[in-house]
């Protein structure tokens, strides 16, 4: 679940911020360090207030309060996009074997098709591809350069 991070200010004359709060700083407690927030700028996320340095990914520790960052909150964990997708990302099906691809698995992608690494091989000769190898995508089949002519000829007969 993705959550918005709101940047707040205690300065009523500061125009660029999203919203100005008229709350005495002593009443705000940081959701991370549990200390009072006396900073001019602070964040609001997951129904709590945060020092800018305290709102961070629970796994990798990257700051989530930076401009353009998204906060993902699931199972009580604050996560950056990368870690969220690594843990809970969308599973899919391999275009070759139709078996499940887990979110953390390494894959090969060709256009809108996704393949397990072990399934990313020539449909004709079963040779696994190396970096720089040329191939053609025919429907969901990947065919190496050497087998393109035979593969298309064989499929035309079917």
UniProtKB/Swiss-Prot annotation:
<keyword id="KW-0539">Nucleus</keyword>
<dbReference type="GO" id="GO:0046872">
    <property type="term" value="F:metal ion binding"/>
</dbReference>
<comment type="function">
    <text>Transcription factor that acts synergistically with tal1/scl and gata1 to specify embryonic dorsal mesoderm to a hematopoietic fate. Induces globin gene expression together with fgf.</text>
</comment>
<protein>
    <recommendedName>
        <fullName>Rhombotin-2</fullName>
    </recommendedName>
</protein>
<dbReference type="GO" id="GO:0032991">
    <property type="term" value="C:protein-containing complex"/>
</dbReference>
<dbReference type="GO" id="GO:0030218">
    <property type="term" value="P:erythrocyte differentiation"/>
</dbReference>
<keyword id="KW-0479">Metal-binding</keyword>
<feature type="domain" description="LIM zinc-binding 1">
    <location>
        <begin position="28"/>
        <end position="90"/>
    </location>
</feature>
<keyword id="KW-0862">Zinc</keyword>
<dbReference type="InterPro" id="IPR050945">
    <property type="entry name" value="LMO_RBTN_TF"/>
</dbReference>
<dbReference type="InterPro" id="IPR001781">
    <property type="entry name" value="Znf_LIM"/>
</dbReference>
<feature type="domain" description="LIM zinc-binding 2">
    <location>
        <begin position="92"/>
        <end position="154"/>
    </location>
</feature>
<dbReference type="GO" id="GO:0005634">
    <property type="term" value="C:nucleus"/>
</dbReference>
<dbReference type="Pfam" id="PF00412">
    <property type="entry name" value="LIM"/>
</dbReference>
<keyword id="KW-0440">LIM domain</keyword>
<keyword id="KW-0217">Developmental protein</keyword>
<keyword id="KW-0677">Repeat</keyword>
